[in-house]
Amino acid sequence: MKTISLITRSFAVAAAIAGSAALGAEESKRPNVVLILADDLGFTDISPFGGEIDTPSIARLAAQGLSFSNYHTAGSCAPARAMLLTGVDSHRNGVPNIPEALPPEQLEYDNYQGVLNDKVVTLASVLQSAGYHTYMTGKWHLGQTPELLPSQRGFDRTIAMGDTGADNWEQRAYLPIYEQANWYADGVEHTLPDDFYSSEYFIDKTIEFIDSNASDDQPFFAYIPFQAVHMPVQAPREYSDKYAGVYDDGWTAMREKRRLAAIEAGVVPENTAPVVTPGTLDWNSLTDEQRRHHARRMEVYAGMVDAMDSHIGRLLAYLESIDEYDNTIFVFTSDNGAEGSDIITQDGGSVLAPWFERVGYNADYETLGERGSWNAIGPSNATIAASPLTYYKFHASEGGLRVPLVMAGPGIDRRNEISDEFVFVTDLMPTILDLVDVENHGGSWEGREIEPLVGTNFASYLSQGQSPIHEPTEPIGYELGGNSALFKGDYKIVMNRTGQGDTEWSLYDIKSDPSEAYDLAEQKPDLLKAMTADYDDYVAANGVLPMPAGYNRVLRILGPALLQLRQDRP
């Protein structure tokens, strides 16, 4: 186990540390919990992990707590959220894939419905039963029928968006697979205000919910799953313009800058190799206009991350004002790696252009990111967000699964450190319950049997540094949409069947080689054989289904809508 002390990167962060009381101060009541989940945030998109984007609020938490550079989640949003909130593998909690991507052959199985089933209990439900106020504001995407909304899964007060994503400026769908953007408040349909901007609104409502009970002695759990930085990537111009010119040298140059900065920050080893994800365009082969548009798309992306961090800062300031900051556990992470879908063309066009025209979206350079625009960074820019890792969202490669994790607050006695201990998304629920001294449900809830937690409680590591969190002989399996991995000690096997067309397993030492530059399959055949056998056991134990021949995720999600658009053309 290796930990690295974070060197304070700016006077502002140093001043924030000096001016704030220690986060671990003892209180007469249980600690509050604030769980902040970014959407499609890449590994080096925050400043503590080597990113150039200004994130002082997250940096403040990192400086006052412990960050994990070897934390892994799922490669797509709903399975990650389901495992985060239940501590149960996605094939057992009902969400092995997003419902929009599930093929018909798999929908015949109860554990392949794409919504939380009744065999799991959420972190919110357990905390609610222990006397916590429970609040959620943001993206849900775990079921939209009344019994599946967050108001029925343990949350007292909610503002929830039910789809894969939505516009950040107004209440409208962002893809033609939806008739409308589906929003709910406390379990009923909700209309957004005219001055809506997602990150601002979520923090406004979180503060409102907390403030409504601030005078009592009950602790609170606030779950804030931002839309940032899921497409459509949108941000107020004042945030995007801060990054004018930053990305003008292109993704190859910026990817290398981030790799070196990540090494300096201590989030990857010094010998981490540079990699080029297959399919990345040659920046120098593009026209000036194409480069200009790609750079602006990334400026808006940076602005959206910056805006999210700014609103997180408002929440931190509010908690200080009511004397709850020092008694609050903060957890910040992302649901999966950066989004690499190629919705927008190099010149600002789109495969969705007919639908854009119908509903009033545009991808114009001059207004990119503002109200009425539709923006995505695309696969080549996504390699910046994932740098120095390989690939991005949906893939089982490190760029899809490895994201930042920052924890601070009572019970997290280690300050200003980065740990390279392996942590998996299902580990967070049992750890949070231990930190607030609430009993694990143990596989039984309200007189019925439910799925037990499968994650490892690492609360003692947060205070005492006891390692390893996972024994080197413990296999941890993963599968989503045919893309598979298994972790064991420092090693990982991976096969991206539907992402890259892999037909053979690759083997990597991801502690020393996080960029997956050196395939060890031929050098360590016995280890590969043992780990593939472990994966087969995982498949059998968790009911993992094979993907049907010819499965294509994009066509499954968008195909019918694109076909309808063609048929509707005059």
What are these regions, as identified by a protein language model?
Residues E26-P31, A38, G42-F43, S67, ...:
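Long, internal low-complexity/basic segments
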Residues I46-S47, Y109-N117, E189-Y197, Y247-D249, ...:
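Active-site rim elements
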Residues S47-I53, S67-H91, P96-I98, M136-L148, ...:
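Short, solvent-exposed turn/loop segments enriched in Gly/Ser/Thr/Pro and often Arg
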Residues P146-G154, Q234-A235, A317-A408, R566-R569:
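Histidine-centered active-site microenvironments of extracellular/periplasmic hydrolases
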